[in-house]
Every structure is written in structure tokens, then in C-alpha cells.
Design a protein with these regions (language model features):
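Boundary at the C-terminal end of the N-terminal hydrophobic targeting segment
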Residues: 19-21
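Extracytoplasmic/secretory-pathway proteins
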Residues: 24-30, 38-206
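Sec-dependent N-terminal signal peptides
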Residues: 5-14
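N-terminal secretory signal peptides that target proteins for export/translocation
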Residues: 1-2
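Hydrophobic alpha-helical membrane context
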Residues: 15-16, 159
Length: 206
């Protein structure tokens, strides 16, 4: 309880002293420096990023932080992973009917994990594609999430392309960008769909 109070005080101090544009890059650098030798400290830093991102509706940073948190926890222990999945499920349930973007983000994370239930998280994550298509992600955040495999400018740095690519729903993405008249995005999606169907060795040769 005391740790949560101290974390909240720290966050309030940071949010008053600096703008989000200043805080989040600084927190990301701190998390990166901590991750190898101090993974638990890195998790605390990422929890702070998650709090700030949700508060300021920085959806790209929220998705990036939850993905990073998942990767660190998977390396720590099986017990930590189980607890993390339960926490993600709780966040997704609480977002239902309140914030469709938050729900889509947590559904996306859960769809990438073995959650041992029949909830169709991948489908739920893309139930509101038109909404995700309107959400813009900062270019640097877009590159970090996609590992710079795609140039976000062709997708207008929208959240839909990130979620769709993570989940591999190329047909839905193609449909949305055809409707939007975005030929560049349509061709990139078609190319990625073909690339993913190639044998692994062929992909490595690329």
C-alpha cells in the first residue's frame, strides 16, 4: 500500500513539473537502462508510464508499455506471468462499455498470450476499427512498437494499423484502407500478408 502511495505522489509531482512530452521519453530511457540488471525496477518505471499514458490518453505509449511489461514479466517467472494475465483480464473487463480504445489495447495484449479461456480477444480488439483508425500515435512510439518494420506515415500513424499488424488481421486492414482510398497502405498490407505466408528461410533471405 505504501509503495502505491509513494508511486502516486511521484507521478503527481512529475505531471505537475513537466509536460507529458518531457516525462514519457525520460521514463522510457530509464526503463531501458534498468531492464537488463534491474528488471523489477524497470517494471515499476513501466507501471508509471502506464499510469501517465492512461491519464493523458497517450494510447500508443500505453500499448507499448503493456507490451514491454509483458516481455519483462515472461522472463521473470511463471507465477508472475499468471498474475499479470489476471491483471490484464481485469483491465479489459473494466474498460468494457467505458473506453473502447483501452479495451482494444488490453484485448490485443491478451490475444498475444496463452490465456486459457475462450474469450475471443483478437476479434474484440478490432470490433471498432473506425475508432482505432482515428487514433494517432507519435512516430517514435509507432516505430518502437513495430520495430521499425513499417513506415507509419503510410498508415497516418494510426492505432488500427499497429493492432491489426500485431494480430495479423491483414484482410480487415486491407478493407479499411481500401475504403479510405489509401493505396500505399493497401499495397503494404498485401505485401506483408504474402511475406507472412512464405517459409521462414525465405523471410530471412529478405
Amino acid at each position: 500500500m505504501m509503495k502505491k502511495i509513494l508511486l502516486t505522489i511521484l507521478i503527481l509531482f512529475l505531471t505537475q513539473a513537466e509536460t507529458t512530452a518531457q516525462i514519457l521519453p525520460k521514463m522510457w530511457r530509464r526503463a531501458k537502462n534498468q531492464e537488463v540488471l534491474q528488471p523489477k525496477d524497470a517494471l515499476r518505471t513501466i507501471d508509471t508510464i502506464i499510469y501517465i499514458a492512461r491519464k493523458r490518453k497517450e494510447y500508443g505509449d500505453l500499448l507499448r508499455a503493456e507490451l514491454r511489461r509483458r516481455q519483462i514479466i515472461l522472463k521473470l517467472s511463471q507465477d508472475s506471468t499468471i498474475l499479470a494475465i489476471d491483471s490484464l483480464k481485469k483491465e479489459e473487463r473494466e474498460a468494457r462499455g467505458k473506453d473502447a480504445v483501452i479495451q482494444a489495447i488490453y484485448s490485443t495484449i491478451l490475444a498475444t498470450l496463452s490465456v486459457n479461456d475462450t474469450t475471443p480477444y483478437a476479434r474484440m480488439a478490432l470490433e471498432r476499427p473506425e475508432l482505432l483508425q482515428r487514433i494517432r500515435v507519435k512516430p517514435k512510439t509507432y516505430r518502437a512498437i513495430t520495430n521499425e518494420e513499417f513506415s507509419g506515415k503510410y498508415f497516418n500513424y494510426d492505432l488500427l494499423s499497429i493492432v491489426g499488424l500485431i494480430l495479423g488481421n491483414y484482410d480487415l486492414l486491407a478493407e479499411r484502407y481500401i475504403q479510405a482510398g489509401n493505396r500505399e497502405a493497401m499495397f503494404l498490407i498485401a505485401f506483408e500478408k504474402i511475406r507472412q505466408q512464405l517459409p521462414e528461410k525465405s523471410q530471412e533471405a529478405d
